[in-house]
């Protein structure tokens, strides 16, 4: 239409109405600009399309301030027109939206939806509006271009019942198409994750935040710096929420959360379910906060495996913030340990094998991200499906639909890094755009052509090439991607598939090169940036293929599914029980979920319109179905067909990848949009500029979008053909009320009507059967009254909503995108108060509003389970099986002791404070505590014995003999002591304080070391009260008249200085108390002790007529008193009074000391008839006047015993070490053993070791200088696990080392394992072959424990002990001829038939660890030792460290390893009882040499060592900590007549822990295992020796030394202190003896020229406190550090224990067993029945029942292969030198060699050659009656074997030749022929 009159050009809203010269991109852009600048941001593409520009301001304001012409008004107008067509024509209406991110597409879509819902203002329309809000809340985000970016494909369907021209809304349906899942874990810079996560964080109350764990302070580690800081949650950086600034971008998150909860409530979600939804959202946020680090799994578990380097615990990834982990576990209803275990491991399917990968920190983080993504995906699906269940109408009641299709905008790059999301969304846009082009160009042209109407052709960009290349079924790009995913192909293979498909075949897709050549290199390498390019309608996009195939798999690991099975949360269980989660079950066990996949397509499909009325069918009857060729119909979700398709297995287990599912969903959309009765509208949303500036129009930016969408071409097309309605002539004439009187055909009548209407030719044309009209023309004739007014008159009669500027999403300016003013992504749907928006009118659903307001006003989790209750519930184990087990009497006695020692610790305290919920764990803790108490008591007793006990026997005496006193003479470094009246004082300390000061110290020092009693005369009357209480002051007593000490060091009474201390009564200066006062002062400050007299010396003095005796251990001397020492003196000038009694001592006392001189008179003293007063006075006189010293008992027997007890202990210890020293010296030089012919098995258990370690171990075993034919290398792989740092599972690494091709894939077979419940049923695979390394060709067998199909995490893993038991139990059953499991039968078959050795021939088993390297001569030396001593059952060699210098931790262990072997084990070897032969390097005797009686595999050993119920502390320490030591214990226990020895000539090197934590854990295990095993050994009666020379004494000594090891450090420290404080020779001697220990050790390594051990010894001595103090204390306290598994004991009735397990109950009958003879007979039958034409017999497998080489890399050990059963990679030239038969012959060399297993060496040739040169096939058979006798057969067999080639002859061939010779069928004699052949070949006949 041209612009009329003075109407401005910009007022023309319809672009096709512009003149033809204005139809270019530039002119259309200019026209849009002119409208944009007058606030008209919209334009029309006639009636078929709408163009909206984002103004970044209000979307509701047009040029006149109202909504007309605005981004809100035009969609309303479009909705009214579509509504009119829906009501009047009963057509389905569909709207397709196009636009880049930031173009306002989501906003326009919301206005359109709101308009339709406003036409039906019912509670249902309100719910549908809320449903759209919930969808957007879950799937929209803020990007750099808009605050409301849709990140999920939406197909929103409104359902109507067309009962009248005003259709009734009866339902709705939300179909979500794969939201951008990668955004959950990878939020792009400057963008946000999905809005609901921010809503939750901002909108919850304080109580709710507390429940959800979103409050409080946390430590944040800054990326890159590693620095931690404390921050509150409001500023906390949430990994899944992007940068913290994204929480403050103008969006009202808090209000959004309230709207979200309100919407769910109005959608009838229960309150508890909304709370659960919030908990899952919180759990997702917390998963993002999990921090992973590398730690050591030091808790001991039964499944542990590996060598010495693993014994301290394997390196695992751990969660550092356990509190956050606990929150996640609580909300998911899981146990914390289970969740952590699931995050650190991931099970994948590699080459049809399930393999568990031990993840590093990066892998664990990705695994956690996968969990979060899966949770959010399932939550979104669950909420949408729940909404659909509430609002969707029944399919058969739906007459018409209105569909809104909106996919995320086209993207030329992926902001989150997900190429798959980018590819699928762009493919969806491509498909939708192609539908648009088809609808406007092709569909119209087809209709016109069918009616023979011609219109001018219009050129346009056809994207069909891109659509076909991307979306074509079978060989489109998405189909190829999905096919490659299902086939398990790599990215490079996918790229090559694209190249074959598209190169030079589709110009829209270009495939890049998979290889690239680096500059300066001539060699092509893998192109890490390989990509393919798609030419989209919007431009070319490069898609990198890296990880695209894996991402398309979209696999949810089986570990996660297995973990969720145990959830206690019904809601979480429902999430994972949805149909959207496609599970893949194991083909062999349907209950085992191997993996799963979250569907990328909606659970529902677009509704199929039901044509219930004739009016609805009128158009369909006349319009041809021109829809595309039908594809394979997609089954309806939920139907049986869908389920069958969903579970169809493929190479990877997946039925469809994300691409195929998305493609299927796109097909459904395309079918829906192109259905015959659907009218399509297309809305093109454009952004005016790239900088989000309001009211700014960038012509270049807009022109690019106009070109991209082809708007100019569409407009030109509509200028020539704007036809959307076809009316048959009758219907057209009826609508126009044409004059019935006009004569002519309907066509002529219609032509007259058209002529009268003057409609332009591009809007009205006549065809053969009807009239083509535009929508405008149709409306002018079909609509009347209010409908016409509404259609043409804008707002007339419109129920649309008035303008609400307060809640407009465009109301912001430059900085805002299309979003809401208040930041709520839902509020652009209108103001809730005004109705018509998401939340509708307030008067609707008032009850729901009330409920919702009450719901969000406080705490939504009120009256629900608390976080702690959820955690306890999640950690609680499910009990499945109950078993009653008896309690032994010894166990009862021990528990009685335990409770006696720990009764004061209440059970509830252990339960709540210690966190031990399980009764058996608490019991173990009590046992541990009781054992620690006993150990501490033992240590205390040792300390008491060493330190306290000697003091009790001989208390320390501070006495000095005369000689000792004289030594303290102050000369040199000697101290200065002096004696006064039996008391010794420190003269050196006193001299500075002597008064007066003028006396020089040199004068005082001359008294040092002497008895200075003579210097101090005493006043008798002041110191003694005499017989009657008083002594005359004139009485004097001369004390110094006699030298009683027997030395010259006595000061006489003539000393010049005596006068200065003489203050007696007769002097001028009488001070009676002066001496007493001075003695009090000296005793208080300077006393050192007393003069000591031995009893012997007292007797000696008595013999010299001295009146000296001992009273109460004090020595008194009456010699002076008796020999005239008494006198009477008065002061000068006074007369001596007469009658003075000088006998102041009672005569009885004097007589006692005179008559009993030299003796102890204590008992006589006590017997004296003295009254108490007199006795007291006599005692006072004795102490003050006659005391000369105390009894010196230091040399008494009692004190000598106490004195030498330390020396005795040292001598005892040194004697043991001395014995060890001589034991170490008793070995002679190395002897070169002879060549040996014994068969040896070398077993290597493998777990998660790296390839280098495994190769070193396997190569060292293969290179041992021992006859290769008599060695069998058996590797047992413990589970399908990829260790950290490995790129393949351990079994694959082992098989690659041994040269086994990946094509060899034997069937897994059942066998018994050590495990709880159903874990006892395990499955394994057997491989065998020959391994060549450095000239050695060694037969090998690999047993891979793969686990049952139901095992998801770490399948097959049961631990190292179980790996040992696989071989031990097999040999046990071989030797006892017991029924075997399928795996054991296969092992027997491989060894006997393939390798060619009877398993009973093997006599010894060498066990080495996978991280151990053995010396070449080790096996030879060990076997030699066995042959020299037939009573030897176990031999170990010397193990050294191969990583000695890795760290200080390993350096500490070098010397300890050396002496533990060369001293300890050598010493125990003297007794023939090495208590621990280490499992890393030990050889065992399998059977007795003479009798063949099983030893190592005897019944008792197997029974005890295979104990499954390991539920007590003692049993766990025995079987889980040190299985090798316990195995040695069992050997000594049950085979007491046999010996275990140590041979230092056999060497091996192992890897020791190099980190402190692992070292501590390893030694904890060793120490505790040692204690518990020695406790087992001590009661044994069979240990050799007598008394202290018995092994029991050595065992007890070892146990004691282990228990009291901490005291040894204290003992040495005590000796050092004694040596430093005393010069006594005893501690010095003891210390010298202990020092000699290391001297003896030094002699050993000097004699052996181990000079480097000097340095290692120093390091070891420095580390002594660690080994002897730190490690034992740590070990004893951590004795109960175990992984307690899922089986626990509780106390039942009558003293029994009830065994509770959640692992199920194992039935032994579930594993079939049969004897070898039965199995052998089956083999023979299978061989006989085989087709004669078969040229080669391969191993007949128990598992496969086929002739395929089960597990063997060669086709059988007894055929005529020239290459001796080598792996395919082996060349013949390598073997032709010595074609050693393995072991049945040399192939083409025709050597007559008998097999070591004659019964099975016979192979099968299709034509056994006879002496005559003819073959069996040439012989004719005739029927004869009667059979030949056995003798006749025997003779003929001998004749045949004499001339036949034994390398190719078979039993069957012999039977055939016999039948030829006797001309009779010999099936009846088959058994005899076989046994006779065996007997002849073995020499028995």
Curated annotation (Swiss-Prot):
EC code(s) of this entry: 2.4.1.16
GO molecular function, one term: chitin synthase activity
Keyword Oxidoreductase on entry: no
Pfam family, one: Cyt-b5
Transmembrane portions of the chain: 894-914, 929-949, 1205-1225, 1599-1619, 1626-1646, 1653-1673
Comp. bias intervals (Basic residues): 609-621
Stretch list, region Disordered: 601-649, 794-817
Residues of this chain annotated as glycosylated in UniProt: 219, 429, 668, 1043, 1068, 1462, 1568, 1759, 1790
GO biological process: one example: fungal-type cell wall organization
SMART domains from the UniProt entry: Cyt-b5 (SM01117), MYSc (SM00242)
Stretches assigned to the Myosin motor domain: 1-789
Record keywords, A-Z: Actin-binding, ATP-binding, Cell membrane, Glycoprotein, Glycosyltransferase, Membrane, Motor protein, Myosin, Nucleotide-binding, Transferase, Transmembrane, Transmembrane helix, Virulence, Zymogen
PTM comment, free text: Maximal activity requires trypsin activation, suggesting a zymogenic nature.
Main location: membrane
Catalysed transformations (reactions): [(1->4)-N-acetyl-beta-D-glucosaminyl](n) + UDP-N-acetyl-alpha-D-glucosamine = [(1->4)-N-acetyl-beta-D-glucosaminyl](n+1) + UDP + H(+)
Region Actin-binding, residue ranges: 666-690
GO-annotated cellular components: cell septum; myosin complex; plasma membrane
Role this protein plays: Polymerizes chitin, a structural polymer of the cell wall and septum, by transferring the sugar moiety of UDP-GlcNAc to the non-reducing end of the growing chitin polymer. CHS5 is required for the sustained growth at 37 degrees Celsius and is of critical importance for virulence. Especially important at infection temperatures for maintaining the cell wall integrity of developing yeast buds, elongating tips of hyphae, and random sites of expansion in sclerotic forms.
Domains (record comment): Contains an N-terminal myosin motor-like domain with a P-loop (MMD) that is involved in the actin-dependent localization to the regions of cell wall growth.
Family to which the UniProt record says this protein belongs: In the N-terminal section; belongs to the TRAFAC class myosin-kinesin ATPase superfamily. Myosin family.
Protein's name according to its UniProt entry: Chitin synthase 5
UniProt organism field: Exophiala dermatitidis
């Amino acid at each position: 239409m041209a612009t009329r009159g003075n109407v401005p050009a910009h007022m023309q809203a319809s672009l096709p109405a512009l003149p033809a010269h204005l139809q270019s991109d530039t002119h259309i852009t200019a026209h849009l600009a002119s409208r944009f600048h007058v606030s008209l941001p919209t334009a029309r593409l006639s009636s078929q399309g709408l163009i909206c520009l984002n103004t970044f301001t209000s979307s509701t304001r047009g040029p006149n301030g109202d909504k007309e012409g605005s981004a809100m008004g035009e969609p309303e107008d479009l909705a009214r027109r579509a509504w009119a067509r829906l009501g009047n024509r009963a057509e389905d209406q569909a709207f397709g939206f196009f636009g880049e991110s930031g173009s306002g597409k989501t906003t326009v879509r919301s206005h359109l939806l709101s308009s339709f819902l406003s036409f039906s203002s019912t509670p249902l329309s309100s719910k549908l509006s809320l449903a759209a809000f919930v969808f957007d809340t879950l799937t929209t985000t803020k990007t750099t271009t808009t605050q409301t970016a849709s990140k999920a494909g939406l197909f929103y369907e409104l359902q109507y019942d067309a009962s009248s021209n005003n259709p009734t809304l009866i339902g709705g349906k939300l179909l979500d198409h794969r939201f951008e899942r990668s955004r959950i874990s990878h939020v792009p810079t400057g963008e946000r994750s999905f809005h609901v996560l921010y809503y939750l964080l901002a909108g919850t109350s304080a109580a709710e935040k507390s429940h959800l764990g979103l409050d409080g302070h946390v430590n944040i580690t800054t990326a890159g710096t590693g620095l931690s800081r404390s921050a509150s949650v409001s500023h906390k950086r949430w990994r899944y929420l992007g940068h913290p600034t994204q929480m403050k971008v103008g969006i009202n998150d808090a209000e959004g959360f309230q709207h979200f909860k309100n919407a769910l409530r109005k959608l009838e979600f229960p309150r508890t379910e909304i709370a659960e939804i919030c908990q899952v959202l919180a759990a997702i946020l917390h998963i993002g906060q999990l921090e992973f680090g590398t730690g050591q799994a030091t808790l001991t578990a039964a499944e542990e495996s590996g060598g010495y380097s693993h014994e301290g615990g394997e390196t695992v990834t751990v969660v550092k913030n356990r509190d956050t982990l606990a929150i996640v576990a609580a909300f998911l209803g899981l146990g914390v340990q289970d969740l952590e275990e699931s995050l650190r491991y991931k099970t994948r399917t590699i080459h049809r094998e399930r393999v568990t990968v031990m993840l590093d920190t990066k892998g664990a983080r990705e695994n956690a991200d996968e969990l979060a993504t899966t949770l959010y995906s399932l939550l979104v699906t669950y909420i949408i499906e729940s909404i659909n269940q509430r609002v969707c109408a029944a399919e058969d009641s739906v007459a018409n639909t209105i569909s809104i299709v909106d996919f995320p905008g086209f993207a030329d790059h992926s902001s989150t890094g997900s190429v798959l999301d980018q590819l699928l969304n762009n493919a969806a846009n491509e498909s939708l755009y192609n539908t648009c082009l088809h609808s406007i160009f092709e569909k119209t042209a087809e209709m016109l052509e069918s009616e023979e109407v011609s219109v001018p052709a219009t050129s346009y960009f056809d994207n069909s090439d891109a659509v076909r290349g991307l979306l074509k079924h079978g060989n489109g790009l998405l189909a190829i991607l999905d096919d490659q995913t299902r086939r398990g192909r790599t990215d490079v293979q996918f790229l090559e598939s694209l190249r074959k498909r598209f190169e030079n075949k589709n110009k829209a897709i270009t495939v890049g090169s998979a290889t690239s050549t680096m500059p300066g290199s001539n060699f092509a390498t893998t192109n890490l940036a390989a990509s393919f390019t798609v030419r989209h309608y919007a431009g070319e996009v490069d898609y990198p293929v890296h990880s695209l195939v894996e991402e398309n798999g979209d696999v949810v690991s089986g570990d996660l599914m297995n973990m969720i099975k145990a959830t206690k949360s019904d809601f979480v269980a429902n999430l994972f029980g949805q149909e959207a989660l496609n599970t893949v079950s194991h083909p062999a066990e349907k209950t085992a979920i191997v993996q799963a996949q979250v569907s990328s397509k909606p659970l529902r499909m677009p509704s199929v319109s039901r044509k219930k009325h004739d009016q609805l069918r009128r158009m369909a009857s006349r319009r041809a179905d021109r829809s595309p060729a039908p594809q394979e119909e997609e089954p309806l979700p939920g139907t049986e067909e869908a389920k069958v398709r969903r579970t169809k297995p493929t190479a990877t287990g997946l039925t469809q990848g994300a691409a195929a599912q998305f493609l299927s969903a796109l097909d459904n959309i395309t079918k829906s949009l192109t259905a015959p009765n659907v009218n399509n509208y297309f809305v093109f949303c454009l952004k005016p500029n790239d900088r989000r500036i309001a009211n700014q129009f960038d012509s270049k930016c807009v022109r690019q979008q106009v070109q991209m969408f082809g708007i100019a071409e569409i407009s030109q097309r509509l200028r020539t053909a704007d036809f959307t309605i076809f009316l048959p002539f009758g219907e057209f004439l009826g609508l126009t009320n044409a004059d019935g009187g006009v004569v002519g055909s309907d066509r002529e009548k219609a032509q007259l009507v058209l002529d009268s209407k003057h409609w332009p030719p591009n809007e009205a044309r006549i065809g053969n059967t009807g009239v083509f009209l535009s929508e405008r023309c149709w409306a002018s004739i079909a609509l009347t009254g209010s409908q016409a007014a509404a259609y043409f008159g804008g707002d007339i009669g419109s129920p649309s909503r008035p303008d609400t500027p307060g809640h407009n999403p465009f109301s912001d300016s430059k900085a805002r995108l299309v979003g809401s003013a208040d930041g709520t992504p839902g509020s652009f749907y209108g103001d809730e108060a005004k109705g018509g928006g998401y939340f509708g009118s307030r008067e609707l659903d008032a009850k729901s509003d009330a409920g919702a307001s009450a719901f969000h006003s406080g705490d939504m989790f009120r009256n629900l389970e608390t976080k702690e209750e959820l955690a306890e519930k999640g950690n609680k184990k499910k009990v499945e099986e109950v078993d009653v087990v008896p309690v032994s009497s010894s166990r009862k006695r021990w528990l009685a002791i335990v409770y006696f020692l720990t009764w004061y610790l209440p059970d509830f305290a252990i339960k709540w404070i210690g966190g031990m919920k399980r009764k058996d764990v608490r019991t173990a803790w009590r046992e541990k505590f009781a054992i620690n108490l006993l150990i501490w008591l033992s240590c205390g007793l040792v300390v008491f014995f060493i330190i306290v006990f000697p003091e009790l026997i001989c208390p320390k005496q501070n006495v000095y003999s005369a000689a000792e006193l004289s030594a303290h003479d102050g000369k040199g470094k000697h101290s200065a002591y002096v004696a006064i009246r039996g008391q010794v004082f420190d003269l050196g300390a006193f001299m500075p304080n002597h008064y007066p000061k003028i006396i020089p110290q040199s004068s005082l020092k001359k008294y040092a070391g002497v008895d200075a009693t003579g210097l101090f005369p005493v006043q008798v009357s002041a110191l003694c009260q005499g017989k009657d209480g008083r002594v005359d002051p004139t009485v004097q007593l001369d004390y110094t008249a006699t030298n009683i000490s027997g030395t010259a060091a006595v000061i006489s009474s003539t000393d010049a200085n005596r006068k200065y201390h003489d203050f007696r009564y007769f002097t001028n200066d009488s001070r009676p108390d002066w001496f007493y006062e001075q003695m009090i002062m000296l005793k208080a400050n300077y006393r050192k002790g007393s003069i000591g007299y031995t009893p012997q010396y007292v007797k000696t003095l008595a013999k010299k007529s001295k009146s000296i005796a001992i009273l109460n251990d004090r020595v008194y001397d009456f010699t002076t008193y008796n020999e005239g020492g008494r006198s009477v003196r008065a002061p000068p000038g006074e007369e001596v009074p007469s009658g003075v009694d000088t006998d102041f001592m009672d005569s009885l006392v004097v007589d006692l000391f005179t008559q009993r001189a030299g003796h102890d008179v204590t008992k006589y003293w006590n017997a004296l008839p003295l009254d108490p007063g007199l006795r007291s006075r006599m005692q006072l006189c004795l102490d003050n006047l006659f005391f000369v010293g105390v009894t010196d008992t230091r040399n008494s027997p009692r004190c000598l015993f106490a004195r030498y007890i330390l020396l005795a202990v040292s001598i005892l210890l040194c004697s043991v070490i001395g014995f060890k020293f001589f034991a170490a010296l008793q070995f002679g030089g190395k002897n070169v053993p002879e060549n040996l012919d014994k068969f040896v098995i070398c077993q290597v258990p493998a777990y998660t070791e790296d390839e280098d370690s495994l190769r070193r171990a396997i190569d060292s075993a293969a290179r041992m200088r021992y006859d290769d034919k008599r060695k069998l290398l058996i590797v047992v792989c413990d589970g399908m696990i990829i260790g950290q740092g490995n790129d393949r599972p351990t079994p694959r690494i082992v098989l690659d080392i041994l040269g086994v091709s990946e094509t060899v894939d034997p069937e897994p077979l059942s066998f018994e394992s050590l495990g709880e419940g159903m874990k006892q049923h395990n499955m394994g695979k057997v491989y065998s072959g020959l391994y060549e390394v450095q000239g050695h060709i060694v037969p090998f067998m690999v047993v891979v424990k793969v686990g049952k199909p139901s095992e998801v995490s770490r399948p097959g893993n049961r631990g190292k002990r179980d790996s040992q038991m696989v071989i031990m139990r097999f040999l046990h059953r071989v030797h006892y001829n017991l029924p075997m499991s399928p795996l054991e039968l296969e092992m027997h078959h491989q060894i006997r038939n393939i390798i060619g050795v009877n398993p009973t021939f093997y006599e010894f088993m060498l066990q080495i660890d996978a991280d151990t390297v053995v010396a070449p001569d080790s096996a030879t030396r060990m076997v030699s030792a066995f042959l020299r001593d037939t009573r030897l059952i176990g031999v170990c060699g010397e193990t050294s460290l191969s990583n000695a210098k890795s760290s200080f931790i390993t350096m500490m262990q070098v010397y300890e390893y050396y002496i533990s072997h060369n001293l300890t084990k050598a010493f125990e070897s003297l007794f023939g009882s090495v208590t621990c032969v280490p499992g890393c390097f030990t050889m065992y005797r399998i059977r007795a040499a003479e009798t063949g009686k099983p030893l190592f595999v005897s019944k008792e050993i197997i029974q005890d060592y295979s104990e499954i119920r390991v539920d007590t502390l003692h049993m766990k320490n025995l079987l889980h900590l040190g299985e090798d030591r316990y195995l040695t214990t069992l050997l000594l226990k049950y085979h007491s007549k046999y010996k275990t020895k140590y041979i230092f000539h056999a060497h091996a090197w192992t890897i020791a822990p190099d980190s402190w934590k692992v070292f501590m854990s390893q030694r904890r295990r060793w120490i505790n295992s040692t204690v518990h095993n020695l406790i087992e050994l001590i009661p044994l009666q069979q240990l050799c020796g007598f008394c202290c020379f018995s092994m029991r004494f050595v065992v007890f000594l070892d146990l004691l030394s282990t228990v009291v090891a901490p005291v040894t450090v204290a003992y040495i420290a005590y000796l050092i202190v004694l040596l430093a404080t005393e010069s006594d020779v005893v501690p010095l001697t003891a210390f010298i003896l202990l020092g000699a220990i290391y001297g003896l050790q030094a002699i050993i390594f000097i004699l052996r020229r181990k000079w480097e051990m000097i340095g290692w010894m120093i390091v070891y001595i420095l580390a002594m406190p660690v080994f002897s103090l730190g490690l034992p204390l740590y070990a004893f306290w951590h004795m109960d550090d175990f992984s307690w598994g899922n089986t626990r004991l509780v106390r039942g009735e009558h003293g029994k224990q009830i065994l509770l397990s959640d692992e199920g109950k194992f039935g032994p009958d579930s594993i079939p067993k049969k004897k070898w003879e039965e199995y052998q007979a089956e083999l023979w039958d299978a061989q006989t029945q085989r087709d004669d034409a078969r040229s080669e017999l391969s191993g007949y497998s128990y598992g496969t029942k086929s002739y395929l080489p089960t597990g063997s890399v060669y086709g059988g050990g007894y055929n005529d292969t020239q290459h001796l059963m080598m792996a395919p990679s082996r060349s013949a030239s390598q073997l032709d030198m010595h074609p050693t038969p393995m072991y049945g012959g040399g192939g083409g060399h025709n050597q007559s060699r008998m097999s070591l297993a004659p019964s099975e060496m016979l192979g099968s040739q299709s034509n056994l050659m006879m002496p005559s040169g003819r073959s069996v096939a040439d012989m004719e058979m005739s029927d004869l009656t009667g059979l030949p006798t056995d003798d006749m057969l025997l003779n003929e067999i001998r004749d045949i074997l004499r001339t036949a080639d034994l390398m190719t002859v078979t039993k069957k061939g012999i039977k055939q030749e016999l039948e030829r010779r006797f001309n009779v069928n010999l099936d009846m004699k088959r058994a005899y022929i076989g046994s006779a052949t065996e007997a002849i070949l073995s020499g028995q006949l």
